Curated annotation (Swiss-Prot):
Record lineage: Eukaryota, Viridiplantae, Streptophyta, Embryophyta, Tracheophyta
Molecular function GO terms recorded: RNA binding
Name assigned to this protein: Pentatricopeptide repeat-containing protein At1g31790
Positions annotated as PPR repeat: 87-121, 122-152, 153-187, 192-226, 229-259, 260-294, 295-330, 331-361, 363-397
Family: Belongs to the PPR family. PCMP-A subfamily.
Native source species: Arabidopsis thaliana (Mouse-ear cress)
Pfam families named in the record: PPR (PF01535)
Length: 409
């Protein structure tokens, strides 16, 4: 007789919910396995040979798909069905959840639920609701709530102000700042330097030069210039650069005893915008002499400036060597600028080396830059080959390159 090993069917697994409030999803874990083996041993005659054991393997239990995360609306409905009263702690958690998930519907239902409740919200709690609506992109609701607030603190003003900046409503942001300034003069709060930096950005966007100059004077009055705040200094340099006042921008830079990367990057941007390409290269050299760290923005503007300097690409090669030394050559934007610069000077082989050194084969800008370099130097066959490779890879080429390729074909 042969020996049989029988595996009973698995018992139903117990569902143990695993909630993780720090993650974006909740999962229902299931790692339960059952294995009840029963063996029936029968006497075997001596004249029979032993046969192999037949094993019926137990099928593995597949884990269930993770359950979807409960939304703010679901929790509010559950509270209503159980007649659970709400409080500021619960509502604050739900407001934070709606803000993180950009849940406009949940934010609206939470607002209605709070209005129907009997709680008397504090300023801190209302600020949480303001932040929720701003995060959900509802600046209109935020302004309505803000305008109806009988008392406001600095956070109330800052949330609405930054919401206007984030949404691109720069005129309203400037108007809010003027109102905030009047409110702060009553001793309610002090305006920090980063608010003034944001106001300067708004002034540049709405082309209000006079208001920006008044903000600069306010920076002196409040002592922020003496503190040499890097963000504020960079904002001032960018502001004057937007209005093509390079002398004023450079004066702000030279007044700094320890100008950092932010301030110098703003100066490099201003000089490139005004077509001062030699000055951009001098800025780059000056940063190196003073030991100031360079960032991607600085390298990008300097390489673009090198494309317009008639030196056969020598300046660009030196900047390239510096980029390799500091580890910026692997950046997608820097590689694109290098390909454009080498293509401008007819150094196609150098452009190809930069292009082929990339480990990321899906960089659209680098592929288009390499095609443009080929066409710029009359190497249309290689350009068309590269366009076919882009099509096979699923990379979209610029329409101007495609039109020029069709003309050459």
């Amino acid at each position: 007789m042969k020996t049989l090993e029988l595996a009973l069917p698995p018992s139903p697994p117990s569902l143990v919910p695993s909630f993780n409030y720090n993650s974006t999803a909740r999962s229902v874990g299931n790692d339960v396995r059952t294995n009840f083996d029963v063996q029936l041993f029968l006497r075997k005659p001596k004249h029979q040979k032993s046969e192999p054991v037949v094993v019926i393997q137990q099928p593995q239990i597949q884990p269930q798909n993770p359950s979807s995360r409960c939304s703010t609306s679901d929790i509010l409905r559950l509270m209503d069905s159980l007649s659970l009263p709400g409080n500021e702690d619960i509502y604050s958690c739900l407001a934070k959840e709606s803000a993180r998930e950009n849940d406009q519907r949940g934010a609206h239902e939470l607002q209605v639920h709070i209005m129907k409740s009997s709680i008397r919200p504090t300023i801190t709690f209302i600020n949480r609701l303001l932040l929720m609506h701003v995060s959900c992109g509802r600046l209109d609701i935020t302004r309505q709530m803000f305008d109806r607030m009988p008392h406001r603190d600095f956070h109330s003003w800052a949330i609405v102000f930054l919401g206007c900046i984030e949404m691109g409503d720069y005129e309203d942001a400037a108007f809010l700042f003027v109102s905030m300034l009047k409110h702060s003069q009553k001793g309610a709060f002090k305006i920090p330097s980063w608010i003034l930096g944001c106001v300067l950005k708004a002034c540049a966007m709405i082309r209000d030069f006079e208001l920006g100059k008044q903000v600069h004077a306010l920076c002196h009055k409040l002592g922020f210039i003496d503190e040499e705040d890097s963000y504020l200094s960079g904002s001032l340099i960018r502001f004057y650069g937007e209005f093509r006042c390079l002398e004023d921008a450079n004066l702000v830079l030279h007044q700094l005893s320890n100008a950092n990367t932010v301030a110098w990057a703003a100066k490099v941007t201003n000089d490139y915008r005004e077509g001062e390409f030699q000055e951009v290269i001098r800025d780059f050299i000056e940063m190196g002499n003073h030991g100031i760290k360079k960032n991607v923005s600085v390298f990008s503007n300097v390489l673009k400036a090198c494309s317009w300097v008639s030196d056969g690409g020598r300046s660009g090669q030196q900047v390239h060597a510096n980029a390799i030394k500091l580890g910026f050559e692997s950046d997608c934007l820097i590689r694109c600028r290098l390909i454009e610069m080498y293509g401008k000077y007819g150094k196609v082989k150098d452009a190809e080396k930069v292009f082929k050194s990339s480990k990321d084969e899906t960089s659209v800008s680098c592929w288009n830059a390499m095609v443009a370099s080929y066409m710029q130097n009359g190497i249309y066959i290689e350009a068309i080959k590269l366009l076919y490779q882009m099509k096979a890879t699923g990379i979209k080429a610029h329409d101007t390159l495609l039109n020029e390729a069709h003309l050459q074909m």
